[in-house]
């Protein structure tokens, strides 16, 4: 454990940030999984709703620096393409 006051504070801050980032990444995985599941079920309405939610979560995560904005854009693009292919 850190000995200096500032090091102790930084350690606490990094733990809080890590927990927040972990939660955001888990949320991303869950919404992406929901979109992919809807696409596999060939349920266009559910897939479209799940895609809207996924886009929101991905954009928020990118805006907060949890993931890179280009990674978010890439995931959104691929999910949109998958939802578009559902008939």
From Swiss-Prot:
A single MF term (Gene Ontology): small ribosomal subunit rRNA binding
| A Gene Ontology term for the protein's cellular component | small ribosomal subunit
State if RNA-binding is listed as a keyword: yes
* Gene Ontology biological process: translation
Q: Which InterPro entries match?
A: Ribosomal_bS20, Ribosomal_bS20_sf
Q: What does this protein do?
A: Binds directly to 16S ribosomal RNA.
Coiled-coil stretches are: none
The gene that this protein is the product of is rpsT
The answer on whether this UniProt entry bears the keyword Ribosomal protein reads yes
List the Pfam families hit by this protein, alphabetically. Ribosomal_S20p
Q: What family does this belong to?
A: Belongs to the bacterial ribosomal protein bS20 family.
Instruction: For the region Disordered, give the residue spans.
Output: 1-26
Superkingdom, according to UniProt? Bacteria
Q: What is this protein called?
A: Small ribosomal subunit protein bS20
Q: Which UniProt keywords apply?
A: Ribonucleoprotein, Ribosomal protein, RNA-binding, rRNA-binding
Disulfide linkage = none
Which PANTHER family is this protein grouped with? 30S RIBOSOMAL PROTEIN S20, SMALL RIBOSOMAL SUBUNIT PROTEIN BS20C
